Structures are given as structure tokens and as C-alpha cells.
A protein has these predicted regions:
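Basic- and aromatic-enriched surface patches that contact anionic nucleotides/nucleic acids
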Residues: 61, 67, 71, 79-175
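N-terminal extension/subdomain marker
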Residues: 1-102
């Protein structure tokens, strides 16, 4: 069975085209997969914490789940050419007010950030099935550099930020 993701498309810093929108946990979980070449091993304790946080339902908020999709064309068009042609002859359809990406039956998006959240959902199906969550699908051009790009994006998301100290975190919570 195919699925269609809908949202807005634009170019962001670094020249990546992104499709941003909302989908249910079920859709994102069912139509995406973790790539073991850059994803960290799941920490059971963290997965359980995430499950409890999601089930509690109080102040539940988190940033977009970041995924990627490689658009491969017969004549190796550049992504900018595909966008300029409104996605013609690709799974991407670009209109003035919305863009859709339709995946074929067995096709999956690659998870870049949000794997722990999606894994927590998979352990609690039924409870969170229809909760909508924000997503960002980074569009790639299907070149042999796609894996390198995903590795770098994963690294930049997970290792470039300055961790919040426990003391600072508690101070913010109890102000």
C-alpha cells in the first residue's frame, strides 16, 4: 500500500530541499527505517523514558522527526531541475500551495533524527497511533554521496549542540 506525505517544500541553509509537514506516528513509523550505518543503538532505558513521556501526555512536545528521501531519475536530473519541473515524472508533485511525496508499496524513508521517538511509538501502538507529529523530509538526488550527506546531517544534529547541564535544566523547570 502506498502513502502520500503532504507539506511545504523549500530550500534551506546548505542548499537542501526539505518537505515539511505533519503526519501520524503510525505513518512515519510504518514508512521509514533506521540506517544502521549512522544510527546509534537504541538504549532500552531511553526508549522506556520516551514511552512514559509520550503516554503521560503532559507538555508533550518535540521537534520535527527528520527523514530523508532519495529521488532517482532515469536521466540523473539535478534536484533543482526536478523542483523547477514541479516534480514531473517523480514521486514528488509540487503545486503552489502544497507539495506531495508518494511512496510506492515497499519504499521507505530513511530516519535521520527521531528514531528513538518512532521506536517508542512502535512499542506502544494503539495509544499514539493517530497523534500528529511534525516531520522534515530532506530530499536527496539519488547520487552515491547520499549516504555521506545523511551521515553529516546526523552528526550535525546530534553532536554540534552544547548539552544542557542537569543544574541548568532543573533551574529552568523550577523557575
Amino acid at each position: 500500500m502506498s502513502v502520500t506525505f503532504e507539506g511545504q517544500i523549500d530550500s534551506v541553509l546548505g542548499g537542501f530541499y526539505c518537505l515539511r509537514g505533519y503526519a501520524t506516528f503510525r505513518e512515519l513509523s510504518s514508512y521509514s527505517k533506521a540506517d544502521p550505518s549512522y544510527q546509534r543503538d537504541l538504549i532500552s532505558e531511553h526508549k522506556n523514558e520516551m514511552r512514559d513521556f509520550l503516554k503521560k501526555g503532559s507538555y508533550v512536545f518535540f521537534p520535527e522527526i527528520i527523514l530523508s528521501y532519495s529521488i532517482k531519475t532515469k536521466n540523473n536530473l539535478l534536484l533543482s531541475q526536478i523542483i523547477s519541473a514541479n516534480g514531473r515524472n517523480t514521486p514528488l508533485k509540487i503545486n503552489k500551495n502544497k507539495t506531495t511525496l508518494t511512496l510506492k508499496d515497499e519504499e521507505k524513508l530513511d530516519r535521520i533524527d527521531g528514531n528513538h521517538r518512532l521506536e517508542a511509538f512502535e512499542k506502544n501502538k494503539g495509544i499514539l497511533d493517530n497523534f500528529k507529529v511534525p516531520f522534515c523530509i530532506i530530499l536527496l538526488d539519488g547520487s552515491e554521496d547520499d549516504l555521506k550527506k545523511k551521515n553529516i546531517i546526523f552528526h550535525n544534529i546530534n553532536f554540534k549542540q552544547i548539552p544542557l547541564s542537569k543544574e541548568k535544566s532543573l533551574a529552568i523547570l523550577f523557575k
